[in-house]
Design a protein with these regions (language model features):
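Transmembrane helical core of 7TM receptor-like proteins
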Residues: 1-322
């Protein structure tokens, strides 16, 4: 809801107030404790996957290189929001500077965009490995996989420059309270002193094209993969392929299910509380679940993690490669 015209000439805002989760002090402390534990577990889970891939030579393959990149991304994805949210639980003001808000906006959504590209790259890797096994070693070399990973990072951090720039140029001169725990484009545009239909349309088109194009690419890849797997005569071969692809599909379902509800469905018009819960799910809970999904459904990753935990015990430290 735009502010009245008579307030349009007020001083521009220098900071925003993130309402977060308004509740009693006791509940705030409880939430702080819960999210602090979730954050630490997320860091530990994704770091374990990175270390397992790094220290096991037999995991230096395109699939696991992409997975290690994905885990590294998840660490920074959750770090872009949770530490600030934890600080706000213990703060009385819950303020964030104007520039700090847009920096968080840029990094959070850039990493979310990068995640869609990595999920697409991982789906393409599985398609080549299962549907084109004879061509896979020549097409998906380690060097090419590294270039694909670098492309995901560069494209992910380039795509959101335009939306961030357009929204940052809107005049903010009235209310500065954001009913959210992060700087989300929807609540930000609602605080603008003037209507900005062009910016809203551009952002909506951008979100829809990005989400649906990558989602269709991923689903098309896995549709072909499933068709190929069903033709495998060996039950053991089918089980191994489904175990690997099943973990990828579970991650895709968690992430895309929540962002579609958030950005390409009527949920955007629902109360702020629902938007917070959905955002919380894809920004905090999915990075926590992903290491569990990959480690529980992938035999090679389970073995690598077991080996990692074994050598980390006191008195048994040695190089994992030995």
């Amino acid at each position: 809801m735009k502010i009245p015209a008579e307030n349009n000439h007020s001083d521009p805002v220098s900071e925003f107030i993130l309402l977060g989760f308004p509740c009693t002090w006791e509940v705030q402390i409880l939430l702080f404790s819960i999210f602090c534990v979730i954050y630490v577990l997320t860091l530990m889970g994704n770091l374990c996957i990175i270390c397992a891939v790094w220290w096991n030579d037999h995991l230096h393959t395109p699939m696991y290189i992409l997975l290690a990149n994905f885990s590294f991304l998840e660490i920074w994805y959750v770090t872009s929001t949770v530490p600030n949210m934890l600080a706000n639980f213990l703060s009385e003001t819950n303020s964030i500077s104007f520039y700090g808000c847009f920096i968080q906006f840029y990094f959070f959504f850039s990493m979310g965009t990068t995640e869609t590209f990595f999920l697409s790259a991982m789906a393409f890797d599985r398609y080549l490995a299962i549907c084109r096994p004879l061509h896979y070693p020549a097409v998906m070399t380690v060097q090419r996989c590294i270039r694909i990973g670098a492309g995901c990072w560069v494209c992910g951090f380039s795509c959101f420059l335009l939306p961030v720039y357009l929204i940052s140029q809107l005049p903010f001169c009235g209310p500065n309270t954001i009913d959210h725990f992060l700087c989300d484009p929807g609540p930000l545009m609602n605080l603008s002193c003037v209507a900005a239909p062009a910016t809203e349309i551009i952002c909506a088109i951008f979100n829809s094209v990005l989400i649906f194009s990558t989602f269709l690419f991923i689903t098309s890849s896995y549709t072909l993969v499933i068709r190929a797997v069903l033709r495998v005569p060996s039950a053991e071969g089918r089980h191994k392929a489904f175990s690997t692809c099943g973990s990828h599909l579970a991650v895709v379902s968690l992430f895309y299910g929540s962002i579609m509800v958030m950005y390409v469905s009527p949920t955007a018009g629902n109360p702020a509380g629902i938007q917070k819960i959905v955002t919380l799910f894809y920004s905090v809970m999915t990075p926590l679940f992903n290491p569990l999904i990959y480690s529980l459904r992938n035999k090679e990753m389970k073995q690598a993690l077991t080996k990692l935990f074994r050598i980390m015990r006191p008195g048994q430290r040695q190089l994992l490669k030995n």
